[in-house]
Amino acid sequence: MSAYIAPSQIAQRQLEYFNGKHVLVAGEVEDMFPLELTAHCESVEVFTSNYSYFRQIRHSDKIKSHFGSEFDVETQADMLLLYWPKAKAEAEYLLAMLMAKLGVNTEIVVVGENRSGVKSIEKMFKEYGPVNKYDSARRCSFYWGNCLNEPKPFNQEEWFKSYTVTLGEQSLTVKSLPGVFSHGEFDLGSRLLLETLPNLSGKVLDFGCGAGVLGAFMAKANPEIAIEMCDINAYAITSSQATLEANGLSGRVFASDIYSDTANDYRFIISNPPFHSGLDTNYNAAETLLGHAPQHLSNHGEMIIVANSFLKYPPIIENAFNNCETLNKTNKFSIYYAKKS
């Protein structure tokens, strides 16, 4: 079995496209195929919004790696290898940003699973130039194209979706970039969690902050707390910072791969964990979040989370804390509470 994800396997069948190129890899890349590319290319750079992947790839001395919501460094790339992202809006955002940066005569290779909507590249790339499918395998497609038209200048500010959410008497302006959980809406799980929260004090972590709805509401309702917000996704980090600024709030927003960059003395950990699909990988991440939480709480620190009720989180929480209460419940969501003894 290949160590590569299916889109990398189809790219691996077409290595001649990359010979002698300066390649920038972006999008939903999550394996070490860029390392193999270094044997065929003049240079390889990786731009990723996934902090976990960045932590893996940054240790390679053969590749320049960049983490962020915007690629704004000097580059000699003359080819973009785009792994098609899950959200179409994120694909549009990446194309607009990277084509503006790389410019006319940049070649593009797009790989992605057919079910992810990679076919959309055919229409989406029209404003830049021609693109055509050259290979299909493993339920994936391989496209090659060329940017012949001058791309429009890119301004990240224009890509934020701005919307207002109201809870009781409190209203909040939320700023959200494409690719962020619940982009443009206030999800029901977060609403239930906020309605259930007690008064907060001390240092509070909003884990998996998304566009910053939870953290901003908590900071607004409890002005004396020291709010910290973390996420694995660079678009979420930038969105949360923008949400805080839009509401005149302050807090520390940073990237973290679960607890890789967090403190260990939080009075509260509050989360709408981004693990709703029930996939094995998500359960592993959730088990780490819940199981290791006591190590990141101060004495008598408390954790309050919202989760889909079908997820078997209470035994994991009970195992970590020796206690677990259900504070609130609907037919879809449950609010779980645990205290470090």
Swiss-Prot record:
Instruction: Report the CDD domains cross-referenced here.
Output: AdoMet_MTases
Q: A Pfam family for this UniProt protein?
A: MTS
| Protein name according to UniProt | Ribosomal RNA small subunit methyltransferase C
One term under GO cellular component? cytoplasm
The record's family statement is: Belongs to the methyltransferase superfamily. RsmC family.
Does the keyword Transferase belong to this entry?
yes
Organism, as annotated: Vibrio parahaemolyticus serotype O3:K6 (strain RIMD 2210633)
- Report the PANTHER family cross-referenced here: RIBOSOMAL RNA SMALL SUBUNIT METHYLTRANSFERASE C (PTHR47816:SF4)
User: Where is the protein situated, by its record's location annotation?
Assistant: Cytoplasm
Q: Which domain of life is it from?
A: Bacteria
Which reactions does this protein catalyse?
guanosine(1207) in 16S rRNA + S-adenosyl-L-methionine = N(2)-methylguanosine(1207) in 16S rRNA + S-adenosyl-L-homocysteine + H(+)
Q: Which Gene3D superfamilies does this entry report, sorted A to Z?
A: Vaccinia Virus protein VP39
Query: What EC identifiers does the entry list?
Result: 2.1.1.172
* Major location (coarse): cytoplasm
Identify a single GO molecular function assigned to this protein: 16S rRNA (guanine(1207)-N(2))-methyltransferase activity
Keyword annotations of the record? Cytoplasm, Methyltransferase, rRNA processing, S-adenosyl-L-methionine, Transferase
Function field: Specifically methylates the guanine in position 1207 of 16S rRNA in the 30S particle.
Q: How does it assemble?
A: Monomer.
